[in-house]
Amino acid sequence: SIIKLTASSTADSNRTVAHGLGVKPSFVLFRRTSNSAWFVWSAGLTTENNYLYLQDTYGVGALTQNANIWGNQSFTSQHISWRNSYTFSPNEELIAYVWADIDGYQKTGVYTGTGGALTVTTGFQPRFVMIKRTDSSGQWVMLDEPRGSGDNRLYADSNSEEHTGQGESFTSTGFRPRQTTTNDTNTSGGNYIYFAIA
């Protein structure tokens, strides 16, 4: 679901907007169109009011986690939410990209890094995967099949060129993070969220 709207003119108020999915979202990108800050929510984050920034490498603990970000309420099968004058300012133009898991097509999940061999099961062969470490800093790693079966990275938080030969791969039922101690996808004991699309 893609939602374009104008924030209410009422300051210091919790706001909601319908997303039309009929089920609770699993992954949300939300931003004002006049600013570079992308707020990210994932069902894989520790608590309902946690958030990350798509344009930065911060982990959850490096950001001031506050229930005001998402309007002091949980996302539901009907709406997403935010707080005017906290997350966004009154009368700003906003856009939200909202996804829900669909068996066999799309999945948001979590895994713990091993520093070695690891296979993450999604239940389908992905064509796109985005990965982010949440308990520490780490880049938003984007992998996709058209650019090389998951082996070539782009970073959502950076305008740097493609990084090739990184060692990730897709399987018929999921993906394999790089089999080293890289902080971005497979540090031993590291907590990661992912967003996969078939």
Which ranges hold each PLM region?
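Surface-exposed molecular-recognition determinants
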Residues: 1-198
